[in-house]
Design a protein with these regions (language model features):
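Glycan-recognition and catalytic cores of secretory/periplasmic carbohydrate-active enzymes
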Residues: 1-169
Length: 169
């Protein structure tokens, strides 16, 4: 389950691809084949969920993310090498909602809601520009640990790299 170009280690992104791909395969199959792909979707989703925070990282007074009240619960850690959180979700919340119905596991849908609401915290709009953001800009590298990418450190986000995928996700 490793896929990123910027990390040579385990990461959440490949598990999201696996969960999404097997989800679509389960939608177009029936019977035993459907069950096989649904079970693979569930397995990949559980692995992906292991990358998501179930608690809120504390920020010191004066750190931008703490000052704006960012809650890390529901955010996904990128990898063991790239130690920041980001909004790389795409269809994963929909996959979790489907799994919730498919397996009668309400906690899947519950956590899909946690992820969805958490991801909206840094969406900039007039009157809520999230510190250094501009309308339409969504940060990729949200620095919640002492690991520093060379821009402000913990409690800030790196505004140097914000590709279009953050908007698409």
């Amino acid at each position: 389950f490793s896929s990123t170009l910027d990390a040579n280690c385990e990461d959440k992104e490949a598990s999201l691809y696996a969960a999404t791909a097997t989800y679509y395969l389960s939608l177009i199959t029936k019977g035993e084949e459907h069950r096989h792909y649904a079970d693979l979707t569930k397995k990949a989703a559980y692995f992906a969920l292991s990358w998501y925070y179930l608690w809120d990282v504390p920020f010191a007074p004066g750190q931008m993310l703490g000052d704006i009240g960012l809650k890390t619960r529901g955010w996904g850690n990128v990898s063991v090498e790239n130690n920041h959180i980001d909004v790389f979700v795409f269809e994963f919340a929909s996959v979790l909602q489907w799994l919730s119905k498919e397996y009668a596991e309400p906690r899947m849908a519950d956590f899909a809601e946690v992820i969805s609401t958490s991801m909206r915290q840094l969406l900039p709009y007039e009157g809520h520009l999230c510190g250094i953001a501009k309308s339409g800009f969504y940060p990729e590298v949200v620095q919640h640990t002492n690991w520093d990418y060379g821009k402000n450190g913990k409690g800030y986000y790196n505004d140097i790299f914000a590709p279009g995928w953050t908007v698409a996700s």
